[in-house]
UniProtKB/Swiss-Prot annotation:
PANTHER family to which the protein is assigned, alphabetical: LARGE RIBOSOMAL SUBUNIT PROTEIN EL15 (PTHR11847:SF4), RIBOSOMAL PROTEIN L15 (PTHR11847)
Protein name: Large ribosomal subunit protein eL15
Family assignment from sequence similarity: Belongs to the eukaryotic ribosomal protein eL15 family.
A matching Pfam family: Ribosomal_L15e
GO CC annotation: cytosolic large ribosomal subunit
HAMAP family (UniProt xref): Ribosomal_eL15
Keywords of this entry: Ribonucleoprotein, Ribosomal protein
Amino acid sequence: MGMYKYIREAWKSPKKSYVGQLLKQRMIKWRREPAVVRIERPTRLDRARALGYQAKQGYVIVRVRVRRGGRKRPRWKGGRKPSKMGQVKYSPKKSLQWIAEEKAARKFPNLEVLNSYWVGEDGMYKWFEVIMVDPHHPVIKSDPKIAWIALKHHKGRVFRGLTSAGKKGRGLRNKGKGAEKIRPSIRANEGKGK
């Protein structure tokens, strides 16, 4: 087995391998950090490489913390029955991974989100690492594998659901029978696709 295969096997079931103990120690530190942090290198090198990361200029790795569970909506100021306030029991129509990608994109507006992957969770939070690319960097522009991200129609791709997590949330992994209301978009089909 090559190095990447060993890493992948260890991360398949983190609690049973050495990764579990490492994660415990790391999360103690991660909880004290801000929600969005730029890091030097990926925690899961095998996953990052599989999703398009390269150790060269123009690539940035960002670790994002997202609160788990449903979305608590803001409290109303006007008077109403507490049961009709509509604060709890509403879940967002986006995955936490997609939300994490958007958080990273807002923190670094000059970069584009390429992809992301899970790195850990506890009872309150989930952590994802987001691979970001600088579309204006000459190294990126001259690399034919990633130069497409510099084109203007890929600007703000994460906010339009064009990343892998976004496409999954929009139901675009399905096609054929049962997926008639998914394309061109859920909104075009008056929300019947979800």
